Amino acid sequence: MKAPAVPDWSAKLARTGWWHSMELPGESIEGVRSVAEMRESLARFPVPEDLRGMRVLDIGAWDGWFTFEMERRGARATAVDCWDNPRFRYARERLGSGAEYVVADVYELSPERLGRFDLVLFFGVLYHLKHPLLALERVCALATEAVFVESWVTGGKPGGRPAMEFYEAGELGGQTDNWTGPNTACLLAFCRGAGFARVELRAVKDSRAHAACYRRWPPPEAGAGPAPELLKVAHNTGGGLNFSSRRDEYVSCWFRPAGAGLSRENVQPEVGGFGSRPLYVGRKEGGAWQANFKLPPGLTPGWHEVRVRAGGSAASNALRIAVDLAAEPGDLAIAGLADGVAWTPGALSGDVLALWVRGLPENADCANVRVRLAGRELAVEYIAPPGDEARQVNARLPGPVPPGGYEVTVAAGRAEAAAMVSVCRS
């Protein structure tokens, strides 16, 4: 498919050397984009005039007009680009700017490297990327409130079918650094899929789409309905409460709402205050509902509260999950063991072994607790929640074990405990 025609800026860029026009002390620089055009583009987003006390990140800063405008409004501004632009450094010096300048690829960006920002500008970058969705996930992780995205689009209606063109060798405007051309629906879907709670199309003009992407749900309206009861939260595939921010992981939660008629459009889960759009919402037996959603990008290591709102309700009670937490047990000890069906103390006659273990870490789950019998790994199927001094752990044998006495070990992190069990039959 032939890409839509794009203006040829090459002659003007070659003549001026600047992409952004600049008003510097005692000097006006004419770039490809006029100051009026950039002000018009920025005005399509709800950027406050007063940004004092806020950190703002400008990704794809180029010559820096948007960076310096954020600083002019009072923000602590940081600019990022994939190459060291001498024109940015020149303008920063002339303006006496204190903006930080970071040369890095968008895929290298992380909260650990840059910190977190109230607002992120992501203008004119997406179509230069081979992996636009991955980039949006990286950008989402950096923002605590909002990311404003401006990108080339191939057209299409916002509610149409998402589609994207791939430009292998300069098909878009003759530039070999233009790789992708999403249509408007695809751009919005990318933003939602990257982990933003809300995505709002602000404008489409001259094949440029402007999307405001928010990390949080709006606050409940006055007179919001009764809060649902959050029953359980677990890893979508592992079933435990431990999650890794370095992976593309998903959360399942079960809740009991006060009303009915729920869908993906009116269920609002959140983790650590960051909203995440449900990928699945369905009713289960007994009046409970289940929602599956992406773990929000950029969570700090530690415990995070999960809540859910449903059908315009207030927020539910909170349950906690662990993100990037190592299992750090106390002094592990096996306080008792028994057959998991017959409950014969000290003996195993079936396929399930029940143990009572002291010293397990609070974030112990089936993924980070290991049980072995005679050196063979058992499948951990259940761990009792924290509360009792000794927590029950159920593990299933992988196959037949001859009668006799065997050593059983339980390990969490670098700690391990052992006991003996008598296998009567298998």
Where does each model-flagged region fall?
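Conserved class I S-adenosyl-L-methionine
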Residues: 54-62
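Conserved alpha-helix/loop element of class I SAM-dependent methyltransferases that forms part
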Residues: 32-52
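N-terminal, positively charged/glycine-rich alpha-helical extensions of SAM-dependent methyltransferases
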Residues: 1-26
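A glycine-biased structural micro-motif
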Residues: 53, 115-116
